[in-house]
Amino acid sequence: MIQLFRRIGAFNNLNTLYKEKVNLLKKLRETDLPILHTLIYSSEKPRWTLYNAPYFDEYKQLNLETFLQSENRLFFLSENVLAIVHEERIIGVVTRYWEDIRTRWLEIGIVIYDDSLWSHGIGTSALQEWIGICFKAFPEIERVGLTTWSGNPGMMRLSEKLGMTQEARIRKVRYYKGTYYDSIKYGILRDEFFALK
């Protein structure tokens, strides 16, 4: 997560660029961080870590004080992250970062920390909203991408439900617990996305 924060770069202010009604997503505030901390670090090995790039082995359980003093705090409060809200409570986040800002290559991600809410259509709605926000915030970009791995079939299905195209499958480059998995890249172009709406 910290590596992701370092790659982000500057983004324009979300609130001034996106004026449409937001249904599922909201900007995180300082007062939301203890709630988010509980969601993320509720156990030594939460279920979401099994699917969110576990081959990087980056998850470390942090106490609240350490979390609030870490770079993760800045990451979650940045314009590159919005909270996913369901029934008035935070359940996850959507993120974005520049793979290469010079070539206008933007990538997005999503984590729903509460696994009891997986496969309820919430992720689909949240990412659809987020893609729209990204295209509106950056009128110069023509594509939004998402990278996952073959060990996360739920994310693959979600990407396809959103109308994203599988643009690349880099075979056997994610070695995890004795098994090789593929890295899978999805993308959707601006005109494709707005044609679906």
Where are these regions (language model features)?
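Short, P/G- and charge-enriched loop/turn segments at secondary-structure junctions
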Residues: 13, 68-73
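Generic structural signal for well-ordered secondary structure
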Residues: 29, 57-60, 77
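Conserved GNAT-fold acetyl-CoA-binding loop/helix
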Residues: 45-69
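Short loop/turn motifs at secondary-structure junctions and domain boundaries
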Residues: 72-77, 164
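Acyl-donor (CoA/ACP) binding surface of acyl/acetyltransferases
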Residues: 1-39, 81, 85-197
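Hydrophobic alpha-helical core bundles mediating ligand binding, dimerization, or RNAP-core interactions
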Residues: 36-44, 64, 68, 127
